[in-house]
Amino acid sequence: MILNKLKMRQIKINSTTGSEIVLTATAKDYMRVSTTADDNIIGRMITQARIWCENYISRDIVAKNRTYYIPETNGTFDLPFAPVASISSITSDGTAVDYTVLGLDNETIELDGGSADKVKVTYVTSGLDDSLLQQAIMQLVSTYYDNRADFSSDQKSNIETIPTDVRDILNSYKSMFL
């Protein structure tokens, strides 16, 4: 059991550096909400929907500073939640290592020294922003908003599953990394 834990890859968000791609006003227009009474709730739902979408596609929609840990590598590996804007550092067992960035989204790393242990990469993702992602987030926010009070103590969850059209929109962005 301990051996398996030592072999686990880990990813951590150090900070969120970007902004939401869907504004509260835009989501309210989409949902035809004219009052300001629910602005805070809708804002939180936008963040929740965006995070769900990011986890579904394994890509950052809003730019973030991340740290990725790999217990061992053959020298070539992919960074999760690309595209990558910049790499701050790569260390192996606490020592800086030289590397080459490969790929269209700067997500593939090749360590110049080959295989390495205890590799830690700190990097910044650039995020994604286009109308399809905005549409998926707005549809999901609308589902959350319309079902915000649909809870009952005798059922596990009354909220409808994620709308199929949201998944369909996101499938073209989906990375098979995680």
Language-model-detected regions and their locations in the chain:
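Divalent metal-cofactor coordination and adjacent catalytic microenvironments
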Residues: 1-178
